[in-house]
């Protein structure tokens, strides 16, 4: 959705770039975006924010110096900082340690909760 694209742009500019410091991100490795399915692929569950076009899963990054980081292998200080910075820009942020379904990627979506952002 347009809201998700705007949130992604805001996160890149205000969260990802500052978190990476001097490392210039030239590519964000997207694992999933729009896909019509239920949450966590569970039969009979609620439709996922991916199915509404409001979610992006980030699997890693490529840098200008040719190095690459995956969330699964490089959930380091900079990536944790970028993950934390997404909270509030997105309605939901999930990643390693959140729930078992997001150990190898960062999940961001623009769901709107009355209680505020859900960040884990």
Where are these regions (language model features)?
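Active-site acidic/histidine clusters and adjacent loop/turn architecture
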Residues: 1-28
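Detector for Asparagine
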Residues: 14, 38-41, 74-76
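Catalytic cores and adjacent binding grooves of peptidoglycan-active enzymes
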Residues: 17, 29, 47-120
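Active-site-adjacent substructure of cysteine-protease-like catalytic cores
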Residues: 20-53
């Amino acid at each position: 959705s347009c809201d998700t694209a705007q949130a992604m742009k805001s996160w890149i500019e205000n969260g990802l770039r500052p978190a990476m410091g001097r490392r210039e991100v030239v590519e964000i490795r997207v694992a999933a975006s729009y896909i019509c399915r239920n949450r966590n692929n569970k039969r009979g569950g609620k439709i996922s924010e991916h199915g509404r076009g409001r979610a992006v899963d980030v699997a890693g990054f490529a840098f200008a110096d040719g190095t690459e980081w995956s969330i699964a292998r490089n959930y380091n200080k900079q990536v944790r900082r970028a993950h934390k910075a997404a909270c509030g820009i997105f309605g939901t942020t999930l990643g390693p340690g959140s729930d078992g379904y997001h150990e190898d990627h960062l999940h961001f979506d623009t769901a709107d909760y009355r209680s505020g952002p859900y960040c884990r």
